[in-house]
């Protein structure tokens, strides 16, 4: 198939729409846990094609959005130190901390760089041997192998001035946290795309069985998502809760074994505080103790006193599937992409950014 045109074929999408609306006979709340899915759902107006029984619920699928304010404050403290080049992905620069943001600090003269790839941090360290280069690494298992690859190069080449602030997180743990909340009503899940390429589909089987909820691993294109929704509808009707791999063209049961081995070589699980979800055991990654000499949280003073979230912002509720962006009183008004109050409006994968771009009201 043509990966663009065929997966956006209007006639095929409308045919799936008819099947979904015909076979869907009771409410089905589907949570996607991938920011790319959120944007595709809104961009292609899929809620209007699935009928009245299907409700898309947006979960913690954006790594920038789930970053707690305390970690942003740590980043700002490190970036403010003398003789430091601080680098991270561009979306992180605009996320507000308790008192400031990386973008504001850069405007004040601090050397803060937005990287295109983690390997750019290695080049910076080699080109600036008199500087301490700190790489603030974020992302799910999709980007963790790239950070592990960078660590490996630093170790092999004996680079002495590059440090890591690791903020990588994993998928299964937050799903368990969400499902343990008695206020959450989720009937099925759209499994992440790129994350699953690394992890494989096998890791979701335990979740599906534990919570008796079907999971469909879906690609990003509208045809992918519609086919996945149809499968979830049919599983609901049949009373089954299996893992359906719609994205089989990219996702295998065991995932990318070499990438997982590289991650395991340098990282180990740790507890991590998620925005909106609180601390979740073994949901994050950190450098192994033998590589603590590269860990910015070990080598520098990262202690901070973080303020609570803005009372006007409901990002936490959105990430738990308890609210939608349009439920927020400041959405599209005080809070917008030029002046984000919360992280869900900052990131290109955030639910609020998707609603603002594709379905803004008023």
Model-identified regions with their sequence ranges:
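Metallocofactor- and cofactor-centric catalytic cores in central/energy metabolism, strongly enriched
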Residues: 1-130, 144, 152-157, 165, ...
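Short, conserved secondary-structure transition motifs
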Residues: 168-175, 255-258
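A conserved active-site cap/scaffold subdomain adjacent to cofactor or substrate pockets
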Residues: 165, 183-249
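Internal helical hairpin/lid segments
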Residues: 227-317
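A short secondary-structure junction signal
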Residues: 145-149, 176-178, 200-203, 227-229
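Flexible, glycine/charged-enriched surface loops at secondary-structure junctions
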Residues: 27-30, 162, 238-248, 274, ...
């Amino acid at each position: 198939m043509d990966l663009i045109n065929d997966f956006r074929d209007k006639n095929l999408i409308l045919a799936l729409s008819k099947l979904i609306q015909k076979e869907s006979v009771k409410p089905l709340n589907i949570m996607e846990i991938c920011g790319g899915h959120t944007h595709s759902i809104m961009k292609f107006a899929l809620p209007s094609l699935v009928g009245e029984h299907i409700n898309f619920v947006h979960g913690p699928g954006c790594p920038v959005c789930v970053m707690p304010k305390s970690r942003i404050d740590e980043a700002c403290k490190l970036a403010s130190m003398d003789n430091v080049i601080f680098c991270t992905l561009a979306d992180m620069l605009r996320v507000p901390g308790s008192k400031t943001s990386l973008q504001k600090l850069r405007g004040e003269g601090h050397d803060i760089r937005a990287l295109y790839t983690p390997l750019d941090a290695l080049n910076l360290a080699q080109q600036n041997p008199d500087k301490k280069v700190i790489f603030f690494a974020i992302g799910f298992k999709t980007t963790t192998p790239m950070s592990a690859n960078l660590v490996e190069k630093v170790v092999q080449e004996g680079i002495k001035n590059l440090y890591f602030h690791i903020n990588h997180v994993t998928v299964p743990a937050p799903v368990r946290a969400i499902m343990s909340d008695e206020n959450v009503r989720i009937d099925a899940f759209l499994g992440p795309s790129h994350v699953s390429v690394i992890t494989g589909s096998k890791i979701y089987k335990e979740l599906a069985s534990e919570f008796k909820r079907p999971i469909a691993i879906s690609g990003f294109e509208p045809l992918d998502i519609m086919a996945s929704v149809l499968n979830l509808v049919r599983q609901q009707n049949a009373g089954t809760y299996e893992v359906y791999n719609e994205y089989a063209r990219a996702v295998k049961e065991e995932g990318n074994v070499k990438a997982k081995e590289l991650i395991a070589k340098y990282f180990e699980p740790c507890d991590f505080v998620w925005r909106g979800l609180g601390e979740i055991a073994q949901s994050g990654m950190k450098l192994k103790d033998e590589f603590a000499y590269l860990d910015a949280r070990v080598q520098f003073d990262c202690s901070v006193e973080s303020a609570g979230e803005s009372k006007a912002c409901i990002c936490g509720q959105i990430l738990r599937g308890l609210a939608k962006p349009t439920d927020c009183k400041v959405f599209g008004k005080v809070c917008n992409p030029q002046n984000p109050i919360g992280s869900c409006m900052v990131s290109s994968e955030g639910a609020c950014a998707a609603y603002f771009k594709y379905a803004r009201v008023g």
